[in-house]
Amino acid sequence: MREIISLHIGQAGVQIGNACWELYCKEHGILPNGQLDQNKMDDESAESFFSPTSVGTYVPRTLMVDLEPGVLDSIKTGKYRELYHPGQLISGKEDAANNYARGHYTVGKEIIEPAMEQIRRMADSCDGLQGFLIYHSFGGGTGSGFASLMMDRLAAEFGKKSKLEFSVYPAPKIATAVVEPYNSILTTHTTLDYSDCSFLVDNEAIYDMCRNLGIQRPYYTDINRVIAQVVSSITASLRFPGSLNVDLTEFQTNLVPYPRIHFPLVAYSPMLSKEKAAHEKLSVQEITNACFEPQNQMVRCDTRKGKYMACCLLFRGDVNPKEANNATANVKAKRTNQFVEWCPTGFKVGINSRKPTVLDGEAMAEVSRAVCALSNTTAISEAWKRLNNKFDLMFSKRAFVHWYVGEGMEEGEFSEAREDLAMLEDDYERISSNAEPVDEY
């Protein structure tokens, strides 16, 4: 069995986790108390994400950590309270106050040991641990500081195992904290060498998707359910049998041409409301084309200005290989999708026969087929550029820096992180002009 452990860190990580596990349970026919739904056939596919117990229940292979107890308390009293083992929900007593240094150096240090102990316990119960999925936000104190501390420890203890991130990136216009640019650049710098592949999501792009689904005022629940659908499509091939499945290491092999250039752009189609779905039946070609439209991207950036290095198309549901290959060939032939000269083929296709599932009360319609595109494109460097500019504006005045220094951080770490991000920006620039990134490790 190839098991995967999911780590949900900070408020965003835990709330996305809540939505994901709710969806996984429905997909695998697992009830909120961990028992199998008698109407669903028991297939072993659940065991890569769920651990079967001696009494016949299934427990998620997951750990949820937050430095303040509020969000985890709501899970402990919520609908799925019986699903998790109490040791899987670890909270501190005071939060990281949007401060990377608190999450990484002071408050985070107090709970890293119990968290690592729980991870070791879960890893020991696996037959063949494939790797870790880490869910967190860049902007929060716990999501940035504690996540990078944990990834540092994971690299030391489980060096060879894959580590994939699902990260909430600060949206261009919506900020949840003034110091988001600091936290984001510090965490990107610290995790750059530890993460094998990082899928970015920005709230603004998801807000727009929710509006397309007819949700006028999206709540975090709506946003997280959209993210959960996308994560489910990316992980479907790890959980269900399929004719062209993709495993964890295949993502890296096919999407990451250089170790640091590991931030694929994620797009998902179709995003249909129930009203629209009643009048539309989209073909494989149509949903594939839609994945290259800006409104279906998880991060705001202009792909026409960038070049593709690689693209992974993960189809699920009613799709046959011939249709998938034709759709891919047509996308490749389009002049707007430019590939770098040294990567002429550029497409990897995965097909999974299990169609997408939607949760009760969700705005999204149930469809017979969907596709998730993971594209490594130089256009995503726009996101780093925006963030670097915001960082520079604040750091030139040393604004808010004393909060970080007061928690044991050195001011030099800011400059070091910023230099690293400048190099990352430069690497993308060089690839765009068909040169190689500098100094390849």
Swiss-Prot record:
Give the site residues for Involved in polymerization: 441
Coarse class of the primary localization is: cytoplasm
- What Pfam families does the entry give? Tubulin, Tubulin_C
Which residues take part in binding Mg(2+)? 68
The similarity annotation says:
Belongs to the tubulin family.
Functional note:
Tubulin is the major constituent of microtubules, a cylinder consisting of laterally associated linear protofilaments composed of alpha- and beta-tubulin heterodimers. Microtubules grow by the addition of GTP-tubulin dimers to the microtubule end, where a stabilizing cap forms. Below the cap, tubulin dimers are in GDP-bound state, owing to GTPase activity of alpha-tubulin.
Protein name (Swiss-Prot/TrEMBL) = Tubulin alpha chain
The organism named in the record is: Encephalitozoon cuniculi (strain GB-M1)
